[in-house]
A protein has these predicted regions:
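Conserved hydrophobic packing residues within short motifs/helices of P-loop NTPase cores
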Residues: 74, 105-107, 138
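Cap/lid segment of the alpha/beta-hydrolase catalytic domain
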Residues: 1-28, 84-86
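Short, conserved loop/helix-junction motifs that constitute active-site signature segments
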Residues: 97-101, 127-131
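Short beta-strand/loop motif that positions the catalytic acidic residue
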Residues: 100, 106-108, 112
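Short, surface-exposed alpha-helical segments at coil->helix boundaries
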Residues: 94, 117-122, 153
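Conserved alpha/beta-hydrolase "acid-adjacent" motif
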Residues: 113-120, 147
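C-terminal catalytic histidine-bearing segment of alpha/beta-hydrolase fold enzymes
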Residues: 130-168
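Primarily recognizes the serine-hydrolase "nucleophile elbow" in alpha/beta-hydrolase
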Residues: 28-96
Length: 168
């Protein structure tokens, strides 16, 4: 993005109005994308999935909680908190994560130094409001980057499980 927002607002919670406004802007932008996808005859808007990697995975606490047109979430190297101060309640992910109730697959590296497994990913997984049978956490003996073959296989299997195989 070339929006003039300092890089620190992209990754770290803080209690500023700027951080709050940026989070609201991200959600509005995401909703506009879905509005557009719904106008396309070549897109089945009943089968929209959220995929987030790293900071996009962290946004998986918020976007699937407030955008009900998303039916599945795949979170890669995401987690619940990366604090530098306490965010305003209206954008504190702890207030949203339990509202994520769609089937959710999380993939995470046990040795991720960017988004801690123990302090961010596991707490997010435990607090997601999705029924146990519809959420899955796979932990790899890696760092922030999941091996691509496993990532692709698990993601496609998850999409096929809930959306069915892609028609040919």
């Amino acid at each position: 993005r070339q929006d003039g927002i300092p890089g620190s607002l992209h990754y770290w919670y803080n209690d500023s109005h700027e951080f709050r406004d940026y989070q609201v802007k991200i959600v509005k932008d995401f909703k506009r994308v879905i509005d557009y996808l719904e106008t396309r005859s070549d897109i089945d808007s009943r089968k929209l999935a959220y995929y987030g990697f790293s900071w996009g995975g962290i946004l998986g606490n918020l976007i699937p909680a407030v955008e009900k047109r998303i039916k599945i979430a795949i979170i890669n190297a995401g987690g619940l908190k990366m604090y530098k101060g306490k965010p305003k309640p209206e954008v504190d992910y702890i207030n949203y994560v339990s509202r994520v109730t769609i089937p959710t697959l999380m993939l995470h590296g046990r040795y991720d130094a960017n988004v801690s497994y123990d302090n961010a990913a596991k707490p997010m997984f435990d607090l997601i409001g999705t029924q146990e049978k519809d959420k899955k956490l796979i932990v790899y003996e890696t760092d922030h980057i999941i091996p691509h073959k496993e990532l692709i296989k698990e993601s496609l299997d998850w999409l096929d499980l809930y959306f069915g195989p892609v028609g040919r």
